[in-house]
Structure formats: structure tokens, C-alpha cells
Regions:
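Conserved, mostly hydrophobic/aromatic
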Residues: 59, 87, 156, 169, ...
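Extracellular/luminal regions of secreted and cell-surface proteins that mediate adhesion/ECM remodeling
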Residues: 331-459
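Bacterial N-terminal signal peptides that target proteins for export
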Residues: 1-12
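N-terminal substrate-binding region of glycoside hydrolase catalytic domains
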Residues: 27-145, 267-326
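Catalytic-core regions of glycoside hydrolase
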Residues: 28-48, 88-92, 168-175, 182-318
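Non-catalytic accessory regions flanking glycosidase/transglycosidase catalytic cores in CAZymes
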Residues: 24-86, 93, 145, 151, ...
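Active-site groove signature of glycoside hydrolases
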Residues: 125-145, 152-188
Length: 459
């Protein structure tokens, strides 16, 4: 009799367990190319550039310091607001640089500093050498100017750090175009102490919006303040021209050569801070061809892979639509830039009253995703409308190329309506309300709803 009762209990327990674990949906998700206008990566035009003939998610612009700063602690943010609002209205995020001197343009030194007597050197290059035109280099050692730069950076950070309209900013402020040089008049550039104070000001107030510097510098550098161990990225503004290390003494200014000279911290910077830049203007457009015409052009993909670059200004593809083969190659190359996430599989288990979800993701790009954007799951109906959303604490930041798949998991309460016709989907939330969605390299991306990756049916 006892044996019969034991058997009955065993069978009942088995039936209860079977009733609890109702269905499991194990999905092998197919790969598909990701779009070239994923957010915070890719090729970047100047703001409002006519044509806009290549997919993009960001726009770049310069701003003159004197247009923004009217007194030691008096600022006019209207030009910045017009810029950011205009870019955001197109679903894009902004990269900007503020300058004090720009070859060929009038000085950007604020009027109150001119009236205080800050000296400005007017000079012109040999026309055979860029930058062409007249330059106005202020005395970067003048304490009044240095304090003004610190004041401006502080106000900028307090107002705009973490603003969802902003993608990145380049440090600017010092040197021609804000590029931290006054070549060939190196004697007019900012002394190291001024550079250090500018960097310290950025470090104090820009905690969320990434700041990028023009030149890597180690402790032993004679002309630049050491920055390899500071929380900044870099921008290579002679990309695919002065990028790869040639080993020649005359090319020691090339980007990868300067990285090596700055040490391991600079070489590994891309793991935690973004790399950007600009394709050298002489090779705009053609750099994407199988055989660029210009003899000095370096292989674009090799440069991407060795620098781990995330974004690049490249006006050549935005001035007019490229020929079909150039366009096709450029799209493929942009996919290699920055992050490129693929979800190979997902498992969805209905346990009666809740759903367990596990998802694997890999990064097949050349760099991580640097911003801490939120993520959420949703149950989508047949029309692609979310009938229920579940915020999840999953992180997509810090996943490096070549890392083992990152595993995400969550237990969710079942939606109130029957699950049979619902699809479980995932998205990364762009904090810019109408910003480009981050899209995965999967056929299920946007299948049931724009911006959502369909993981599988809710069992």
C-alpha cells in the first residue's frame, strides 16, 4: 500500500512540474547586415550639409568661442541651441568643436578678452603649406585667457554634459581649428601648463559626454600635456593618410606612431574611450574605392581595424551621391566601424505565471559601445504594438570584439492577454526621443516593429 501511495505522489509531482514548465521556445536567430546609420557610429557630414546622400546618425559643426562667451561668466547659448535642436530634429546627434582661431577667419577670441589686452599674433603661412590664410593666435599663456577657457568649459559641462542631443565633443579651443597645433608656428601654441588646465577642466565637468583629444601624449612628450591615462578618447584628423605607422622618422606624427610613443595606455584607449576623426580631405570619397587614385591613401579597412575607430567625418560621400560600387563598399566599411552587435540565439520559457528569457549577444565590430543606454523587452502584438514592456538591467557597454558571448537573462511576469500571438522583442533605448534606434545584425531586427529585435514567440 505504501508503495502505491509513493507512486501516486511521484506521478502527481511530475504532473505538477509538467504543468509549471509549459513550453520552451529556443530560437536560433539569423544574421543580417546591420544598417550604416546605427547611432553614435559611422560617417559624419557637416551639419545641414546639402544632399545628405549617405546614411548617417550624427552631424558635425564648429562653433566660435566669441559667439558663446560674452564675459568672464556671461554666456550666450543660443547658437549652441540652434545647432543641437536642428540636428536633433533630423533624428541625429551632434559632434562639435569650439575654436578660438581658424585659419582664414576672423579671431574667435571673446571681445572682453580683447578689451582686457590679451595679445593676438596675426600670421600667414607659406601658401604652399596648410593651413592657408591669415591666422590669429592668442597668447595662450595669458592667465586671463586660461581662466576664461576654464570658466567656459565649466559652464559648458554644467549645461550640456549628458545631453541626449550630444554624441561626442572634441576638446578644441587651442590652436588652428581647435586642433591643438599652430603648425608650422609651434612657438605660438599653448604651453603645456595651459593644456593641463584645459584638460583638468574637461575632466571635472564632462563625466557622461565623451571628450576626444587630437594627439595622444605620454609622460615624456615635450610639446603636449600627458593624456594617455586621462579619461578622454582621441580623434585622428588625417585618417587613412597619416594613420598607419610607416616607421619613417618624417612620419612620426602619424596617428598610430603617436599612439605607440604614448605607451600601452594610449594603445588600449579604444577599449574604454571612443576613437573618432576625419578622413583626410584630399582622399574624400576615393578612400572607399578598391584602388584609390591618390598615392598617399592608406587602406581604409586596415586603418579601421588598427585604430578601432567609431566615427569619422567624411564630406566626400555627402556632397553628391557616390557611384554604386563606391557606395556599396562604403556601406560595408562603415559596418566595420565601432560596434556591430549580433544576437545568435534566445531562449524563452513559459513557466506558468512568468516567462524566463535568456539571450546571447556578440560584438563583431572593432570597438565597444561606450554609452550606458537602457534596454527593455516588450510583448508585441500582431501589429507590432507593445502590449507590455519590461525594463531590464542588461548592459551593452564594454562588450569588446572577440569577447565570449555576453549572456543576458530575466524573469518576467506574463502579460495579461493570451501569449499565443505575442512576440517577445528587445531594444536598446536611444535617449534622444526621435533618435536613430540601435539595430542588431539580425534578420529579426525591425521585423515586427521599427527599432525592436524580435526574439521569438511568447509560448
Amino acid at each position: 500500500m505504501g508503495g502505491i501511495l509513493y507512486s501516486c505522489r511521484f506521478i502527481c509531482c511530475w504532473l505538477i512540474a509538467a504543468a509549471v514548465v509549459r513550453e520552451v521556445s529556443a530560437e536560433q536567430l539569423e544574421h543580417a547586415p546591420s544598417p550604416p546609420d546605427n547611432p553614435l557610429k559611422g560617417l559624419v557630414p557637416y551639419s545641414g550639409m546639402a544632399g545628405m546622400t549617405f546614411p548617417h546618425s550624427m552631424e558635425f559643426e564648429y562653433l566660435r568661442l566669441s559667439d558663446l562667451m560674452k564675459g568672464a561668466s556671461v554666456f550666450d547659448w543660443q547658437p549652441m541651441e540652434v545647432l543641437l535642436t536642428g540636428i536633433a530634429s533630423r533624428g541625429n546627434q551632434a559632434i562639435f568643436r569650439v575654436w578660438v582661431e581658424y585659419p582664414g577667419k576672423e579671431s574667435g577670441l571673446p571681445k572682453f578678452l580683447v578689451e582686457q589686452g590679451v595679445k593676438v599674433a596675426r600670421w600667414k603661412n607659406d601658401p604652399e603649406q596648410p593651413p592657408a590664410g591669415v591666422s590669429y593666435s592668442p597668447d595662450y599663456a595669458d592667465e586671463r585667457l586660461v581662466q576664461a577657457l576654464e570658466s567656459f568649459i565649466t559652464a559648458l559641462g554644467q549645461r550640456y554634459d549628458g545631453d541626449p542631443r550630444l554624441a561626442y565633443l572634441t576638446a578644441g579651443l587651442l590652436g588652428s581649428w581647435g586642433e591643438w597645433h599652430t603648425w608650422p608656428r609651434d612657438d605660438l601654441f599653448a604651453p603645456v601648463k595651459t593644456q593641463q588646465r584645459v584638460l583638468a577642466a574637461y575632466q571635472r565637468v564632462l563625466k557622461r559626454t565623451p571628450v576626444l583629444l587630437r594627439y595622444p601624449a605620454g609622460e615624456a612628450h615635450s610639446g603636449f600635456a600627458a593624456n594617455a591615462n586621462l579619461p578622454f578618447g582621441y580623434h585622428d584628423d588625417s585618417f587613412a593618410w597619416g594613420t598607419l605607422d610607416s616607421g619613417k622618422e618624417s612620419d612620426r606624427w602619424f596617428y598610430l606612431a603617436t599612439l605607440k610613443a604614448a605607451g600601452d595606455s594610449a594603445l588600449n584607449k579604444w577599449r574604454t574611450h571612443p576613437i573618432g576623426g576625419e578622413v583626410r580631405p584630399e582622399i574624400w570619397g576615393q578612400v572607399h574605392d578598391a584602388k584609390p587614385e591618390h598615392a598617399k591613401a592608406q587602406d581604409f579597412l586596415t586603418c579601421v581595424e588598427q585604430t578601432h575607430v567609431t566615427w569619422l567625418m567624411e564630406s566626400g560621400l555627402f556632397e553628391k551621391r557616390a557611384a554604386p560600387e563606391r557606395y556599396r563598399r562604403a556601406v560595408e566599411q562603415v559596418r566595420r566601424m565601432g560596434y556591430d552587435f549580433h544576437v545568435p540565439n534566445a531562449t524563452i520559457t513559459n513557466e506558468g505565471g512568468r516567462v524566463k528569457v535568456s539571450v546571447s549577444v556578440v560584438n563583431q565590430g572593432v570597438a565597444p559601445f561606450y554609452r550606458d543606454w537602457g534596454m527593455e523587452l516588450a510583448a508585441l502584438d500582431a501589429e507590432g504594438h507593445p502590449v507590455q514592456r519590461w525594463p531590464v538591467d542588461w548592459k551593452i557597454t564594454g562588450l569588446l570584439p572577440g569577447d565570449a558571448p555576453r549572456e543576458w537573462s530575466a524573469a518576467l511576469p506574463l502579460p495579461k492577454q493570451p501569449t499565443g500571438k505575442l512576440t517577445l522583442a528587445l531594444r536598446v533605448i536611444n535617449p534622444l526621443p526621435n533618435g536613430k534606434p540601435l539595430r542588431f545584425a539580425n534578420t529579426g531586427q525591425d521585423r515586427h516593429a521599427p527599432g525592436w529585435l524580435s526574439l521569438g514567440p511568447l509560448p
